């Protein structure tokens, strides 16, 4: 089987491999399918192992992601090296995979800038306890005071189209970067085919209007938040949806961590993510095999 482009029709095939092997957003269903067009993701499956590659960001033809599926990680990488047949470059390798790989392989590892995932304790985001979260709690209290009749509604295949319409009308692409426009477009696509992805999400409503919404997925002990949108005219909406998402999934699934993805080198995003005091940064590396 040759490598083939990843499309929505492949969700059912790839989903079993993209579950709970790593906490990194890059090895999750939406992490792959939302960004497949952007990074040129391709895949093939052989002997129960999923191989994925992307257009190289470093001048070569392809970089390969960690293979997922049956057998040990090292066995899967041996199989990948046989598949590639020549010099192997891997990207988006989580830091916690390096020690195991070093047992059997010689490679150079370089941290990839601006793509480390922000990892938070789920209880911190759910309850915002302590002095360091006082500003967040104040904004939530303001939202509750201004909109006492707010409701939290689970996103389903039946109501996702209404959220998508809200995106189309209320989240303008004017003045946004190419990357932000791509994210907006693919957020709408996720909503339009919501059931296919098997993800979870919630909309924060005030008087029937969508003030904010979020979409993510639970992988093992971690909630990965892929999408979070809000209207700035609803003061405190971002803080409220962030808190409610973490609290709901903590109570429902017993998660330990929330992964709020990377900051892509954007200073505004970096400050916003740091303001929630991450427990640690999930670093990712590019590997060159000898």
Regions found by a protein language model. Give the residues of each.
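Short, extreme N-terminal leader segments that mark the start of a protein/domain
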Residues: 1-19, 232, 285
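A residue-level signal for conserved active-site and pocket-lining positions in enzyme catalytic cores
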Residues: 14, 143, 273
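A conserved short alpha-helix in the GNAT/GCN5 acetyltransferase fold that borders
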Residues: 77-82, 143, 242-250
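Aromatic (often tryptophan-rich) hydrophobic motifs at membrane interfaces
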Residues: 200-289
């Amino acid at each position: 089987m040759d490598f083939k482009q990843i499309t929505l029709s492949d969700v059912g095939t790839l989903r079993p491999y993209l579950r709970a092997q790593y906490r990194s957003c890059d090895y999750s269903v939406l992490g792959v399918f939302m960004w497949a067009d952007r990074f040129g993701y391709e895949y093939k499956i052989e002997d129960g192992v999923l191989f994925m590659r992307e257009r190289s960001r470093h001048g070569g033809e392809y970089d390969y992601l960690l293979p997922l599926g049956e057998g040990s990680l090292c066995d899967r990488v041996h199989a990948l090296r046989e598949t590639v047949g020549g010099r192997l470059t891997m990207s988006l390798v989580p830091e916690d995979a390096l020690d195991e790989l070093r047992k059997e392989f010689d490679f150079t590892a370089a941290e990839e800038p601006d793509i480390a995932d922000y990892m938070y304790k789920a209880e911190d985001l759910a309850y915002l306890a302590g002095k360091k979260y006082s500003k967040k709690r104040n904004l939530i209290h303001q939202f509750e005071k201004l909109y006492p009749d707010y409701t939290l509604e689970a996103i389903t295949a039946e109501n996702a189209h209404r959220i998508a319409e809200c995106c189309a009308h209320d989240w303008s692409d004017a003045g946004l970067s190419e990357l932000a426009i791509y994210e907006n477009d693919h957020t709408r696509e996720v909503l339009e085919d919501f059931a296919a992805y098997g993800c979870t999400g919630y909309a924060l409503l005030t008087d029937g209007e969508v003030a904010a919404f979020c979409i993510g997925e639970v992988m093992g002990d971690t909630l990965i938040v892929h999408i979070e949108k809000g209207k700035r005219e609803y003061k405190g909406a971002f803080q409220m949806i962030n808190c409610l998402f973490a609290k709901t999934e903590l109570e429902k699934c017993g998660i330990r961590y929330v992964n709020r993805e990377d900051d892509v080198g954007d200073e505004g995003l970096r400050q916003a993510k740091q303001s929630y005091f991450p427990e640690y940064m999930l670093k990712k590396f590019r590997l060159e095999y000898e």
